[in-house]
Amino acid sequence: MTELRIYATRGAGVEADRDSAVAAAPEALLSTSNAEQISAQLKTRGIKFQRWPSKPKLEQGAMQEQILEAYASLIASVQKNEGYQTVDVMRVERDQISGSTLRQTFRQEHQHAEDEVRFFVEGCGLFALHIKDEVLQVICEANDWIAIPAGTRHWFDMGVDPNYCVIRFFKNSGGWAASFTHDPIADHYPGLDQARKQTTQG
């Protein structure tokens, strides 16, 4: 389930132990799974969010060419309106050797010199956006499109058992490049698995 949670950064705690740090995270100021509310809340903070129509004819595990063809008109519209020059497909699967390394890298707070724009074709992931004195956690699932402006402090968690596929949009043909803040803030907030568990329990 797609969900947005908004936390205040103050009072998150500074414990070194990961479990106690997560437990010390503040209560969410807002929690919603309503797509319109999610879009509206993110928009006020400069984040773009949309739900794209599903492509029922696209099989699970489809190749890059099939995915790009299925979403060609929507991709072209985004490129025309936003100026993104390069588009590719990234798939991370459970048995992928580099999965744990990628998770460790993406979970560190970082920034980009250009927008981070993703459309979820399959699976899910958690974007955490550190904006002023707030942390906004967005669980994105299939058919979610999100655009995070350049310079926004954020991190991404794919979970302990990753399995997702996204379309990535870039203005720079060089692809993904990050500047890490070395702020351990991500340790003080739930990761994807705990966030989804909390959603189920709620």
From Swiss-Prot:
It is an enzyme of class 1 (oxidoreductase). It holds the Pfam family ARD. The record marks 109 as: May play a role in metal incorporation in vivo. Its cofactor is Fe(2+); Ni(2+). It catalyses: 1,2-dihydroxy-5-(methylsulfanyl)pent-1-en-3-one + O2 = 3-(methylsulfanyl)propanoate + CO + formate + 2 H(+); 1,2-dihydroxy-5-(methylsulfanyl)pent-1-en-3-one + O2 = 4-methylsulfanyl-2-oxobutanoate + formate + 2 H(+). The keyword NADP does not apply. Keywords: Amino-acid biosynthesis, Dioxygenase, Iron, Metal-binding, Methionine biosynthesis, Nickel, Oxidoreductase. Binds 1 Fe(2+) cation per monomer. Binds 1 nickel ion per monomer. GO terms for molecular function: acireductone dioxygenase (Ni2+-requiring) activity; acireductone dioxygenase [iron(II)-requiring] activity; iron ion binding; nickel cation binding. Ni(2+) binds at residues 110, 112, 116, 154. Pathway: Amino-acid biosynthesis; L-methionine biosynthesis via salvage pathway; L-methionine from S-methyl-5-thio-alpha-D-ribose 1-phosphate: step 5/6. The record marks 115 as: May play a role in transmitting local conformational changes. Its EC number is 1.13.11.54, 1.13.11.53. Catalyzes 2 different reactions between oxygen and the acireductone 1,2-dihydroxy-3-keto-5-methylthiopentene (DHK-MTPene) depending upon the metal bound in the active site. Fe-containing acireductone dioxygenase (Fe-ARD) produces formate and 2-keto-4-methylthiobutyrate (KMTB), the alpha-ketoacid precursor of methionine in the methionine recycle pathway. Ni-containing acireductone dioxygenase (Ni-ARD) produces methylthiopropionate, carbon monoxide and formate, and does not lie on the methionine recycle pathway. Monomer. This is Acireductone dioxygenase. The lineage of its organism: Bacteria, Bacillati, Cyanobacteriota, Cyanophyceae, Synechococcales. The gene is mtnD.
